[in-house]
Amino acid sequence: MENYDILIKNCQVLNPDMNVSSTCSVGIKDTWIKKIGSADEFVDSVATETLDGKGKLVMPGLIDGHTHTCQQLLRGRVADEYPMVWTRFLVPFESNLLPEDSYVSGQLACLEMIKNGTTAFADSGGVHMERVADAVIESGMRAAIAKSTMDMGNAITGAMKETASEAIDHTKELYKNYQGAGDGRVDIWFAIRQVMTCSRDLITMVGECAKELHTGIHAHLCEHKDEVSFCLQKYRKRPAEFLDEMGILGPNLLTAHNVMLSDHDIALMAERGVKMIHCPRANLANHGFPKAPQILEAGASVGLGCDGAAPSNLDIFDEMKVLRYSMLAYWGLPSFNPVVMTCPTLLKMASQGGANAIGHGDILGSVKEGKKADLILLNIDQPHITPTQNLVNTIVDAANGHDVIDSIINGCLLYTSPSPRDRSLS
């Protein structure tokens, strides 16, 4: 007789190859996916908690590869504003946050992500990130957390204005106190806010410290043309080339946005094993169309991010749709290529690509025996999803965070959506 912590019965599973299984059951034990098999294989099994999987799809938890949890309280403020939004709104706002503000903002972000099927995220940092880490630990989520580091530029104000040494010391302290916290769910990374606000000294120190502590680096890169222009004028190199010269490009680097990349940039970053994150809605609203198909063709690992709640929401399902149709319109239609950005590719970005980006591709990103039980159950027995002749296509085109019924992180059931009757009664 096999004992499980959670047993999901009579469900369908999204396999790592993006095909959907026939009806099966999933056994979870000690934070891991222990067994996936037919109902007959679980006939003698017992579980602490049993979930009815009928009409549900078990899929990997989505991973938000680039967000700003400290901007949760800024929702709705930056839409329809003239550039530069980050200097006029984001940095001044973050600079004035109190520790309790960052904590509450972190709590709200975690709650929204869990409800929308996101089980892990990478935060490129703000202020008082120790309080964000507290919120993550309490929520049960998984996260790679960095502290925003900047030491130059007229846009830096208040609590975000530091010397290079101060910025590094603060991240080291965060690492000392929180690395591996929450049963291993929290990782502490270093950050390069962007090349326009980080000196050579700071970038060098970030690279050295990340290497010494065997951790990651989170950077905004090639987000907008001003950044590229700055680099060309100051360093006579494009941003990716400059960071490569500084020894930063490598497998432990996560770059967000990646809009203004040249073909040489793409080849260089793919060769170095850089993990790239696209933020479709943020990119289209402020920066332009990324070369996502070309980046994938170069063999780079690509994930998706929401870039925080300030302009919209924290729903990776929405990001998949926006990237799909923007790439079809911009790259597909001119060459009559309807498969320039396929639905299975987008689902892989939202799961496996994100797992690679946060350094856990070996244990996260797919529903497979021996991987961590970071799973979501999607209600597919609904009129906007069923019937369908291709469930994977329909998930990308029609599903959203409201279709998430259950969220399991690290083997713990953190969220169960109330039934329609329960919602009406409440």
Language-model segments: which ranges?
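His/Asp/Glu-enriched, well-ordered alpha-helical/loop segment
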Residues: 245-252, 293-382, 397-399
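Metal-coordinating catalytic core of metallo-dependent amide/deamination hydrolases
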Residues: 132-259
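Conserved small/polar residues in nucleotide/adenosyl-binding loops
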Residues: 415-422
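C-terminal cap of metal-dependent C-N hydrolases
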Residues: 11, 372-414
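Alpha-helical scaffold segments that flank or form the walls of functional sites
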Residues: 77-141, 167-182
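Active-site gating loops and adjacent loop-to-helix segments of metal-dependent hydrolytic enzymes
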Residues: 73-104, 147-165, 225-250, 275, ...
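Histidine-rich, glycine-flanked metal-binding segment
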Residues: 1-6, 13-59
